[in-house]
Amino acid sequence: MASSTHPEMPELSGSYENKYLCLTICGYRKAGMTEEDYHNHMVHISAPMTKHLMVKYGIRRWTQIHNQAATRALMAELFDPQMANVADFDCFSQVVFQNVEDYKRMKQDPWYQEHLVGDHENFADTKRTLVTIGWIEEFVRDGEAVDGFKS
């Protein structure tokens, strides 16, 4: 039964056996932080602290896509009527896992709580962060046409 604080979960459509979920975090850097400092913190401080914990909880892949002013400027070469709105996020972080429970258990880990929750406040504008989750459907991998995500 659904409540106002916990709505009823809708049924997942299609077959999701042997599929992976991708949590996408669209993040902004903390006010006053340069792109270089943000990138440095994400790659050289946050990632080393996080990646082994993710492996411990069955995370399959974690990537960061850094969306700096220089790379956003490349969009001028790709603009067309269908690709005209450029996202202004500083980073897209994508976490791939098979079961949402794995990610939830990782976030409940005492080490995560002690070290990573507070670290996010050192570099991220967490009030502006946007998140979404969806199934991965893969069609090209390493320059080859494929029919699905490799598990």
Curated annotation (Swiss-Prot):
Residues 31-126 form the EthD domain. Pfam families: EthD. Pathway: Secondary metabolite biosynthesis. It comes from the Eukaryota. Its EC number is 4.1.1.-. Decarboxylase; part of the gene cluster that mediates the biosynthesis of the tetrahydroxanthone dimer neosartorin, which exhibits antibacterial activity. The two different monomeric units appear to be synthesized by the same set of enzymes, among which the Baeyer-Villiger monooxygenase nsrF is the key enzyme for the divergence of the biosynthetic routes. The pathway begins with the synthesis of atrochrysone thioester by the polyketide synthase nsrB. The atrochrysone carboxyl ACP thioesterase nsrC then breaks the thioester bond and releases the atrochrysone carboxylic acid from AacuL. This is Decarboxylase nsrE.
